[in-house]
Amino acid sequence: MKERSTELVQGFRHSVPYINAHRGKTFVIMLSGEAIAEANFVGIINDIALLHSLGIRLVVVYGARPQIDTLLREQRCDPRYHKQIRITDARTLALVKQAAGQVQLDITARLSMSLSNTPLAGAHINVVSGNFIIAQPLGVDDGVDYCHSGRIRRIDEAALRCQLDAGAIVLLGPVAVSVTGESFNLTTEEIATHLAIKLQAEKLIGFCAAQGVCSDDGSIAAELLPNEAEQRVSALEAAGKAAQASTRFLRGAITACRSGVGRSHLISYLEDGALLQELFSRDGIGTQIVMESAEQIRRANINDIGGILALIRPLEQQGILVRRSREQLEREIERFTLIERDSLTIACAALYPFPQERMGEMACVAVHPDYRNSARGEQLLQRITAQARQMGLEKLFVLTTRSLHWFQERGFQPVEVDMLPQQKQALYNYQRRSKILLTEL
């Protein structure tokens, strides 16, 4: 009998909204030289090919910093940098070309594999490289001559779009040519950032050793706004980590985000399948830089009925919440506040005012099972409390059968039924025997 995997089925079903959302979008993926040197590089290439098969338009920008440094040391030359940028003299440029050429051939070969026993079976991917970027010299800075290190002068956007429209993966490295026929060594971060901005890409994705950006408590920050990301970058630079791939990418991600790129993602090249987990799951696995949070807390409207019902029905069936019909929800929808993440309602609560007694009831508090160990309940309580104060209410009460201690930890005190508004006392269900807790606003 064949083995059945419900986990596979559920995972695939949950990924469908993201597959549909990403189809036809442009992603710029930055592969640092460190990522290419790792054993998981083959898995990353397979995942990139999978994105292509799902109809995502891909530009892959690769680096070769450690590979170049290795060649230099073999030649008994020390790598030289100024402000995190390589000083590329004529001898170094030759080694840059050698390393970049080797990496490009390796990536192209991997993406061209189509054997029947490989993840790329039947893929037939066209990989295109070319002079899409025109460079110019960096020149002299602080008395330091960068020699053949350069920066972007212009990008041939029309030619890039033509290749993407034809279904090709565009592969670009750190070497670009100039109008004078010279070659220049550019930073991978600059190329990836400017390409994402020029193409108005949906996403800029970078790989580093860490799983993402660490929060103050040591956990991975799921998302950062540009100002928050800048603070993290400043802290990393102050700690002497300016040269790290993650720090360099974050600088570019901040610029891209402020220039119209939807989201920038930082994920680990050490984690197998990190690219797929980041793009096809609700919470991802790394850190994303966004202008606007993927998670919002707002007042509900009539279009949210379905999402709220899906959230509260299991709790109603368990007897935790009092059952509400769709019709009742439609009548009372303006009472509800919800937290939404990627179009999914993950938490909700309602505020029922009793103006005569200057009291309000916080009711129908529900949090999605995946988020119950987070701060979503706290966020809802803060928002409902703020709304109650705006209404001129002086007290807030709840009726609960399961969350007595949670509310007590937040300043609510147990009271008797006679402390409720008269209208609420008349409706109190003595069979349900809900605990009543009240707090002063």
Swiss-Prot record:
Which EC main class describes this enzyme? transferase
Q: Where in the cell is it found?
A: Cytoplasm
- Gene3D superfamilies, from UniProt? 3.40.630.30, Acetylglutamate kinase-like
Q: Which domain of life is it from?
A: Bacteria
Keywords in alphabetical order: Acyltransferase, Amino-acid biosynthesis, Arginine biosynthesis, Cytoplasm, Transferase
Q: Which InterPro entries match?
A: AceGlu_kinase-like_sf (IPR036393), Acyl_CoA_acyltransferase (IPR016181), Asp/Glu/Uridylate_kinase (IPR001048), GNAT_dom (IPR000182), NAGS_kin (IPR033719), NH2A_AcTrfase (IPR010167)
Enzyme Commission number(s) of this protein: 2.3.1.1
Which segments constitute the N-acetyltransferase domain? 295-434
Known catalysed reaction(s)? L-glutamate + acetyl-CoA = N-acetyl-L-glutamate + CoA + H(+)
Q: In which pathway does it act?
A: Amino-acid biosynthesis; L-arginine biosynthesis; N(2)-acetyl-L-ornithine from L-glutamate: step 1/4
Q: Which GO terms describe its molecular function?
A: L-glutamate N-acetyltransferase activity
One GO biological process this protein is involved in is: L-arginine biosynthetic process
Subunit details for this protein? Homohexamer.
Which HAMAP family did the record assign? N_acetyl_glu_synth (MF_01105)
Q: NCBIfam families this protein is in?
A: N-Ac-Glu-synth, PRK05279.1
Q: PANTHER family attached here? A: AMINO-ACID ACETYLTRANSFERASE, AMINO-ACID ACETYLTRANSFERASE NAGS1, CHLOROPLASTIC-RELATED
- Entry similarity comment: Belongs to the acetyltransferase family. ArgA subfamily.
Name of this protein = Amino-acid acetyltransferase
Source species, please? Edwardsiella ictaluri (strain 93-146)
